[in-house]
Amino acid sequence: MPRSQRNDNFIDKTFTIVADILLRVIPTTQREKEAFTYYRDGMSAQSEGEYAEALQNYYEAMRLEIDPYDRSYILYNIGLIHTSNGEHAKAIEYYLQALERNPSLPQAFNNMAVICHYRGEQAVEKEDLETSEAWFDQAADYWKQAIALAPNNYIEAQNWLKNTRRL
């Protein structure tokens, strides 16, 4: 039974009902409907911390989905899972793939910046200042791109850029 049919969460149930209605009303192919169902089930599993199940659903959605814009969100969510699992290199790969298909994803730039900043902090702890500066510079580049797309967001990042004279 698909995850969307066994949700106990009121919000997930409501989302599922609305999504099902939209899928019936909006003219889409069976393949697109299946891709969306897997994507929706992936989001549900991800929100419950069931990352392995979420990844299975996202990979199946990727197999079916042909629209680059829709694929970008699937790839972005796969990146989120890898970030949560501490697999930062993999996460960045997926964020970059998402951005190739949809360059207007400020959240992907932000997440890559957060990873780079974290890696910079790790290098500081190891007293490797050259490496830390390289990571911080990369974080700054990603944050600048995120801010360019969403100027009213990422205030903390904007302050960090100003305080470190990277803006």
UniProtKB/Swiss-Prot annotation:
Keywords carried by this UniProt record: Chloroplast, Membrane, Photosynthesis, Plastid, Repeat, Thylakoid, TPR repeat
TPR repeats: 35-68, 72-105, 120-153
Stored Pfam families: TPR_1
Protein name in UniProt: Photosystem I assembly protein Ycf3
Family stated for the protein in its record: Belongs to the Ycf3 family.
CC annotations in GO: chloroplast thylakoid membrane
Keyword presence, Iron: no
GO biological process: photosynthesis
Mode of membrane association: Peripheral membrane protein
Keyword Repeat carried by entry: yes
Function comment: Essential for the assembly of the photosystem I (PSI) complex. May act as a chaperone-like factor to guide the assembly of the PSI subunits.
Database matches in SMART domains: TPR (SM00028)
InterPro entries: PSI_Ycf3_assembly, TPR-like_helical_dom_sf, TPR_rpt, Ycf3/AcsC/BcsC/TPR_MFPF
Major site of localization recorded for this protein: plastid
Cellular localisation: Plastid, Chloroplast thylakoid membrane
